């Protein structure tokens, strides 16, 4: 932080207020950078939608269409819209000379594409940093255009797919290096070992960073340097890229719901496609210098808002949007438009009408001719509504019905009336069905009530009978209890009389009862002992059986051990024999090596002798011809 500069200079006012702009403080590492559109891109987007007008209505309002044709048409519309959002040149499917891309093309690319203008401003900031930048885009012409744009920056370009558009590049080395990687690759892409990425820029916002070839690069950077590389997705606001980026978070890209939501939003939002909100315009007017602080410290929160939410539009919204003509202006500032329109109104001649001689648009002609999808026979309003316009109402004819002009207001009014009538018919049919159901339910409840009443009467009568029986049983038990008490009293009297006659009779009677109780206890214990003895006998039998099985298993194991020992002994004998054979072979090889060494030494001695002989030989010298004289042999030296 330069404190002297801060204290010596006046404070710079903030470009925008982050609180009013809706900055959420995102630090996820995957950020969205909205981009505008130029006027040509907006008009091309509207033309693409107009080309697929009938297929869009079939896709959203009917279900009896040929799925392969209409679905392919919708996918073609989405693809062309994506190409236009990136750059209009991508619609050219014939050969484009690569030499054309190198002739002052960076400026022209930025003029005809809002996204490339944002990329140019962003790369002008990134090129000031000594870091490696990864740019991911579609392969082919998109990468050619991106490389042509980067030729206007002071960066080193490393293209990892296809052939570079400029084969003879200068040897100048810059601090910033850009790696161009395709969004779809058949094989993994390997960067240099010392490459340390500082930023990833996705020109195609639908790039899946979880793709194997991209994930391998990012995972390698995270393993090597222990940090996540931040990713910036450049997407045109309110375009198909914006819709795909928003709906791709919650829906699978291969489902019908995803295609329906993206197509509907693209059609409805085409009147505001590429139009930045007022809060963001100062940032882009100053060439994205608002992002310098974040580029200095990428760990800081992203200073721009998150992806703006996109509404889920219905088929009615799509049809209403298709019936509305879209007009674009070169200037997006509403205040300046107001001043411009005011000046035009002041200079307008008084004799000129409101409409002037402006030509009737395509959609107005379709409405005037009653040629729209809900009226395939082109019938007038009298036939459609069944209301005759021959009768007068308060002395005047109904203008809308008599004119035969189908306006938006009349269409909406008729549609709302038909919708209300349909809802009322559905409600009446529902009430009729409910009335029949209620009658059937009432009859069933009535039958159930009679059944329950009958069951209740039976239960009450049964309860009364049971109460009577209980009273009788209680009375009988009480009588028997009284009889027992009388008998016990008689027995005690008799025992007293017998005890009076015979001394000790009562004591004998008590001893007899006690002996009987003791005998019963002994019998119970004896039965328990017998059960325990039988259980122990069974356990002994099981134990003997288990011991016999264990002995058999032990015998079998001993046999297996003896067999294994015999096999081991055989293997040892075989190993000894093989070892002896190997020793003999190694000895033979050592003898051969010794012989060959002796032969090599002999050859070396011969070679030394030959070299000495060659050194002793004298060679003649020859003078090179000079000054036009012939060379002469001077003999040997």
UniProtKB/Swiss-Prot annotation:
Biased composition (Polar residues): 618-628
Coiled-coil regions listed: 443-608
Alphabetized GO MF terms: chromatin binding; DNA binding; histone deacetylase activity; nucleosome array spacer activity
Any one biological process term the GO annotation gives: negative regulation of transcription by RNA polymerase II
Transcription is among the record's keywords: yes
One Pfam family linked to the record: HDA2-3
Domain of life: Eukaryota
Key words of the record: Chromatin regulator, Coiled coil, Nucleus, Repressor, Transcription, Transcription regulation
InterPro entries (UniProt xref): HDA1_su2/3_sf, Hda2/3, HDA3
Keyword hit for Coiled coil: yes
GO cellular component terms, semicolon-separated: cytosol; HDA1 complex
UniProt-annotated location(s): Nucleus
Region Disordered, residue ranges: 618-637
Function field: Required for activity of histone deacetylase complexes that are responsible for the deacetylation of lysine residues on the N-terminal part of the core histones (H2A, H2B, H3 and H4). Histone deacetylation gives a tag for epigenetic repression and plays an important role in transcriptional regulation, cell cycle progression and developmental events.
Family: Belongs to the HDA2/3 family. HDA3 subfamily.
Subunit architecture: Probable component of some histone deacetylase complex.
Name recorded for this polypeptide: HDA1 complex subunit 3
Source species: Eremothecium gossypii (strain ATCC 10895 / CBS 109.51 / FGSC 9923 / NRRL Y-1056)
